[in-house]
Amino acid sequence: MSIKSDKWIRRMAEQHGMIEPFAPGQVREQDGRKIVSYGTSSYGYDIRCADEFKIFTNINSTIVDPKNFDEKSFVDFKGDVCIIPPNSFALARTMEYFRIPRSVLTICLGKSTYARCGIIVNVTPFEPEWEGYVTLEFSNTTPLPAKIYAGEGCAQVLFFESDEVCETSYRDRGGKYQGQHGVTLPKT
């Protein structure tokens, strides 16, 4: 299994719609102002956060249960900047829609710009033949409120291609998050 380069990422995005919308290079400025970068890097793709958020609140629930998650545990927010309360978290989604090839698995890691501020981005791997908008989780590990910027980079996706195509893909087994569009809560 080998990591894929910028040339491969560009080719797969432009010819096969693997990433839409797609930035073929690194974008570091918008409208003359510096931003958290996004787009193609040497061996990955820096994804952007959309302006749809679900901010965790503990006023409506007493326990967090991934098998029986209460939607009232979140407050919906739409905007260019999301403020995450201290020691809390928020969910968001990517601006990019992904179509992962059958021979590819991705790993997604948070950007150091956020990590250096105590904001951890968590995303599970994108499995072979998964497609959809990615649900992102931002944890604010600090005792202060923290900002997340919509339309800017937040994590990097690394693409790994196997020497052998998998027997059963995410699509084949009817994965529960296949084709997700909005910020998607836990499912069982």
From Swiss-Prot:
GO terms for molecular function: dCTP deaminase activity; nucleotide binding. Its EC number is 3.5.4.13. It catalyses: dCTP + H2O + H(+) = dUTP + NH4(+). It comes from the Bacteria. Keywords: Hydrolase, Nucleotide metabolism, Nucleotide-binding. InterPro entries: dCTP_deaminase (IPR011962), dUTPase-like_sf (IPR036157), dUTPase_trimeric (IPR033704). Coiled coil: none annotated. The keyword Oxidoreductase does not apply. DCTP binds at residues 111-116, 135-137, 156, 170, 180. GO terms for biological process: dUMP biosynthetic process; dUTP biosynthetic process; nucleobase-containing small molecule interconversion. The active site is at residue 137. Pathway: Pyrimidine metabolism; dUMP biosynthesis; dUMP from dCTP (dUTP route): step 1/2. The keyword Transferase does not apply. SUPFAM superfamilies: dUTPase-like. Homotrimer. Belongs to the dCTP deaminase family. PANTHER family: DCTP DEAMINASE. Catalyzes the deamination of dCTP to dUTP. This is dCTP deaminase. It comes from Cupriavidus necator (strain ATCC 17699 / DSM 428 / KCTC 22496 / NCIMB 10442 / H16 / Stanier 337) (Ralstonia eutropha).
